[in-house]
Design a protein with these regions (language model features):
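Short microdomains enriched in Cys/His and/or Lys/Arg
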Residues: 120, 267-279
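FNR/FR-type flavoprotein reductase catalytic core
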Residues: 82-244
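Ferredoxin-reductase
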Residues: 3-94, 153-154
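Local cysteine-cluster metal-coordination motifs and their immediate loop/turn environment
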Residues: 3-6, 216, 240-265
Length: 279
């Protein structure tokens, strides 16, 4: 059962988890693999958890692993404040608190079966998308063509290096990557992620397209998809920004009549027509 349905008494009560592994992936992103001390944790691609450090507070973090992996779950934490700074100091064996998983707006794992899928990721936006991408790869026969576009500001901000390299070598995924700012260490595509859209081999108008990245990216990705006449109901946007409590109580993530933490964080674009502030 989704923890959004928990009783008022325990909705803010975190459960203990143990850090199984932690690894700094670049200057600001930390990978951690966790296991719940009570052994109970089920989630869907697109959901998130509230991570708490004693005496510091808590922060909403997207789950990056696929639920097909049963040996714990993975997060990627960007260092942006006191709570995330404290998380970056954790080592294997350390404890932290977990609430969740939260979010009723998940990736449509069932509805997308048999369809061609395109993931457009900007920087840290790869983190939640990776959960569904790896779910598809673990259930490859259930889905059609798989395309992943990734744009990063510069090569030093890239992460999951070995995984991205493995994707480039697979014949069941079309992976394209670009960086905004090139240097002598980079030999690949240069430009923003929208410059990769014309390179997509799959028919855009009939594919299911999933977008996640910095807020400025959405406007330009959607304009490009409009030019290719992609139906709005085929586009899904991850709007994880501005979340705080995770249970629709604090109002931080409210957009008009929608709460990102409850109805999202993944929304079908056609459902956001009355919420212009979402983009």
């Amino acid at each position: 059962m989704c923890k959004c349905c928990s009783t008022e008494k325990d909705v803010y009560l975190p459960q203990l988890a143990t850090v199984e592994k932690s690894r700094l992936m670049n200057a600001t992103e930390l990978y951690i693999r966790l296991s719940m001390d009570n052994g109970q944790f089920e989630y869907k691609p697109g959901q998130f958890v509230e991570v708490s450090v004693a005496g510091m507070g808590e922060a909403p973090i997207s789950i990056s692993s696929s639920p097909t992996k049963k040996d714990g779950f993975e997060l990627v934490v960007r260092k942006v404040g006191n709570v995330t700074n404290a998380i970056h100091k954790l080592k294997a064996g350390d404890k932290l608190g977990i609430r969740g998983p939260y979010g009723n707006g998940c990736y449509p794992t069932e509805e997308a079966k048999g369809k061609n899928l395109i993931f457009i990721c900007g920087g840290i936006g790869l983190v939640p998308q990776r959960s569904f991408i790896n779910y598809v790869l673990d259930n490859r026969d259930d889905y059609g063509e798989l395309t992943v576009l990734l744009g990063t500001k510069c090569h030093t901000q890239r992460f999951f290096h070995s995984e991205l390299e493995a994707w480039t070598k697979r014949d069941d995924i079309h992976f394209l990557e670009t960086i905004d700012q090139a240097d002598d260490c980079w030999e690949g595509n240069v430009g923003v992620v929208t410059t990769l859209i014309p390179k997509i081999e799959t028919e855009l108008s009939s594919a299911q397209i999933f977008v996640c990245g910095p807020p400025i990216m959405y406007k330009f990705v959607l304009l490009a998809l409009e030019e290719d006449k992609v139906p709005h109901e085929n586009i899904y946007l991850n709007l994880e920004r501005k979340m705080k409590c995770g249970v629709g109580k604090c109002g931080h993530c409210q957009m008009n009549d929608k709460y990102v933490c409850i109805e999202g964080p993944v929304f079908r674009y056609s459902d956001l027509g009355s919420v212009p502030e979402a983009i």
